[in-house]
């Protein structure tokens, strides 16, 4: 079975075709804000300008390989409303034109499913950290339940905000990671875990404050150590609570080596296995939507056009996981 999937919840517009074995084609057009963070309408404008050429390229690629597309998947949410609508409109038209089923995919679940596909993880506790989301999830009674999540901003958003406040370019995460490597000392910053949830906005403010008095390298390092320790603590507690013997890291912040290392150590100490997908499957990509659409279609789930409206606040636990 071949499924074409379109991702476009935020900055990255990406379309891909996958089958059960592999990614066949993937193409992307990335929106980079001229200054500051993402502007939802500008991002949507970017997506509508690029979606035609992008889809034409992917469909032509399929034709050249003699592939017949059996379904169209799209990121239905969560994400920025204007971006989601652009993608959903294109997906509906394409499904009608090709006369194949349409399937709306939960973006967070897609991060998890492609991670499992590409690493061989079976039933992990998942730390999903990106610019828009920070959650700890695990499958229980047929749904991806959220065990812990941020009470305010996501960890990626916190890193990007801090970066902006000290004059570093967007996205801040990679630059902070680089600077942190040259640090000499740890500066205490507020560590906030409440029950199973974490909070990052106070940390961003405290770090910006500290950057006026201390070396930027030391602040970047301390910011990472503090924020990541919070994430690792909650992931470990979710593993204990949900009795999971595996952990997996997904989302754009998952590219951070230090975060991966901290999770790996925690897993080693618990005698659990740690899974880290390749970088290209960690951030937002079309293949994750195509692949999740494929497993959904194979389990008999599709989305009729009349219920294919976008869902900017779509939660993972709203989806019944029939394919696991
Ligand atoms: P989502 O829609 O799932 O919320 P997103 O639109 O934020 O995703 P991602 O690619 O998943 O996109 O994540 C982008 C975030 O990842 C940014 O906040 C960026 O700073 C962060 N990031 C990227 N590389 C690193 C890194 N090496 N270390 C820390 N953070 C990173
Ligand atoms: Fe994402």
Swiss-Prot record:
Q: Which GO terms describe its molecular function?
A: iron ion binding; N(6)-L-threonylcarbamoyladenine synthase activity
What's the chief localization of this chain? cytoplasm
Q: For this protein, what is the EC number?
A: 2.3.1.234
Gene Ontology cellular-component annotations = cytoplasm; EKC/KEOPS complex
Its required cofactor(s), as named, are: Fe(2+)
Q: Which family does it belong to?
A: Belongs to the KAE1 / TsaD family.
Q: What is this protein called?
A: tRNA N6-adenosine threonylcarbamoyltransferase
Organism expressing this protein natively = Methanothrix thermoacetophila (strain DSM 6194 / JCM 14653 / NBRC 101360 / PT)
The gene name reads: kae1
